[in-house]
Amino acid sequence: MFVRFVQLKVSTEYLKTLQGFYEKIVIPELQKISGCQYACLIQNGNSADEFVSMTFWDTKKEAEDYEKSGVYQSLINQTKPFLAESSEWKIKLSDDFELKYEPVTEEPVLKEYSVAAQSGDKPSDEQNPRMYVRIVSAKVKEGKMDDFKKLYADVVIPTLKNTKGCQYVYLTESMQEENQIISLTIWDSKEDAEQYEKSGRFAELTDKVKHTLSELFQWKMALEKETGKKAKTSEDLEVSRYSVVTGKSFH
């Protein structure tokens, strides 16, 4: 299985409009595409203007064929009126040699992942309006990817599947960044995901796999233990939380 994320930063005036566009335009188009199993629009819990279009595919080739077909670019072009303006400005010289300043639109960012382990099938077509997505991004130590995957399959997945409200679990490996993985979990509700974090289970699982994570992350953990103070590095575990706005299963 293959997962694609298209990250969008949307202008505040179009936050509600995007849902209708996704339901009426994006989902019907994706439903026609061979290999697309599931599509959903999720909204960042910390930044209401940040959305992700998350799609699941049978194979990498079918996802690539979709991108090459022109449909993907057409959908991206149709979203452009909704996108927020960047803090950057474009400077260009006009025909009469005057400098012009134009705002730059926040372009969509595509990220692709191959599913390395999973708890079961793709999300079902029964859309729970309270569904919640939790994404943990981590950097794995060089040469430790196989060990990490085994621990994830043998320890992490069973623990999460026995946790109240956790419906689906996926370990995915980045196709663009070496040794970069994300743990993707889909929950019945935000409350269930938060209770999992508060229970200490997330910290326990992190402790069980930490020896397979990057050397920089391990150094940070050792430093925190020694000093009793929090440290921050470029290879920390990054936890992102999203509410499901809308979605549909196609098979």
Language-model features and meaning:
Residues 1-51, 58-68, 81-182, 186-204, ...:
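Short S/T/G/P-rich N-terminal loop/turn motif that feeds into the first structured element of a domain
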Residues 72-75, 85:
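Short helix C-cap/helix-to-loop transition motifs enriched in small/turn-promoting residues
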